Amino acid sequence: MSPRHAAALGILLFSAASAGAPGGAKPAGDPAKLVVTVNPPAAAPGQEVEVVIRVEPNPGIKVNRYPKMKLQVPAAEGLVGGAEAAVGASEMPPLEHAEQNYYKTVDPVAVKVSVDSRAPRGAHTVPARFTYYYCVAASGYCAPERVSLTIPLQVR
């Protein structure tokens, strides 16, 4: 490779790396709406509830299968036990099948959470973290999205 080609390749790689992803800057606004549901809606102390996160991407946004979407619910003493779930692919598809890395319909992420046997009655909010990766179809910009969210928990 000539020095001129090597310099051009170096500039191209540096530009792509410094932009964070192909296509430049992060678009304004959230890439998707997150819908949180809890089943059953009200639980007794000692019971398990299923927390489900549905990702509804905004127009022009593709949600990646790899890396996996991840939901983390830390333990809250006297309220819930910790839980974690991941949904998606364990590895990236080959480049010739790159479109297979995007969901056509995004799978929900569900996790079973144990309500503490000493949990007080009433309405509570449980903090959680949700991470997913997305790409903007028009620009090729791709990035992780890390969201702190709250899970509504009704203890009866």
Stretches found by the model and what they are:
Residues 1-9:
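Bacterial N-terminal signal peptides that target proteins for export
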Residues 9-11, 61:
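N-terminal leader/targeting segments
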Residues 11-22:
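Hydrophobic h-region of N-terminal signal peptides that target proteins for export
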Residues 22-156:
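Extracellular/lumen-exposed scaffold segments
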